[in-house]
Amino acid sequence: NNFELVVNSFRATHNVSIFITGSNSKLLSGELATHLSGRTVSLRVLPFNFMEFCQYKDISAPDYETLLAEYMTYGGLPLVCGADNKETKEVILNNIYDAVVLKDIVMRNKINSPLVLEKVLDYIVGNSSLTVSGNAIASTLSSNGHKVSAPVVYDYLRCIVDACVCDKVSRYDIRGKKALAFEEKYYVCDLGFLHLKKNRIKDEYNYIIETICYNELISRGYKVYVGKTWKGEIDFIAELNGKIVYIQAAYLLTDEKTIEREFGAYEKIADNYPKYVITLDKHTISRNGIIHYNLIDFLLRKVDL
């Protein structure tokens, strides 16, 4: 209690930099400015990206494909990365998800329906990278015996985003050049949570690759949108220091239909911003000015955007 008085006192009497961390159950980073009269800089601490994950493993001759498979399954939380076996990783992930994430959100926001919050959280994490509607979630949960209104679902989604479990990503109309306030996507901030709650039957790897690419862009400092075109969508519009790039992310280009889907998404986009397709294919097939990158090369920053 009253920690801000102590911090302000130190700052007034000592020439020091003060770093503050804490649980989301007590204080969100966005509220620090209020407590400390605005004299703060918020630094978002993310799970390891893939390059940091490999550095943490400190293997002299790393097999990047094996490391990526582990990263895609268990994510980049340091405590999980340091665990010796799969069973321990699973236990740690479950403990973080249940004891930290859920309890922090419930305590911080005084949630009076923790079970419904858990169902919303499970849904949003298990459907990372898919378009989400609060109305659809409310309808699904209500039909399964968990009656909840759409406004309550949207409030729970806000709490989940505030707790840094998922990011909400807006759509951007490329032709109209404006952000849209509907059909947002949510991306889970650590792949380990996706592993715990995955519920897809097909195309699972495509969604995992998309989530990895999103988190990599965020770790590099990009502002990210989902692109809306007349034909459909572009996975990501990413902006950093005034530079804009387009990115399509997929598992493998296994046939001509898949190639057309990923490269064809850029059809009729009139601007000249760089356009990329990122997949796990070892051999790349850039075409029509669209650059194809291998995912591991992209994550290890061997290629530039």
Give the role of each language-model region:
Residues 27-31, 51-52, 256, 284-288, ...:
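Switch/connector loops and helix/strand junctions flanking conserved nucleotide-binding motifs
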Residues 247:
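Conserved beta3 VAIK motif of the Hanks protein kinase fold
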Residues 86-244:
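Accessory nucleic acid-recognition modules appended to NTPase machines
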Residues 227, 251-295:
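Catalytic cores of nucleic-acid endonucleases
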Residues 4-20, 33-34:
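Conserved catalytic/switch belt of AAA+ P-loop NTPases
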Residues 1:
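SF2 helicase catalytic motif II
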Residues 23-25, 29-131:
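Interdomain motor-coupling "hinge/lid" segment immediately C-terminal to the ATP-binding subdomain
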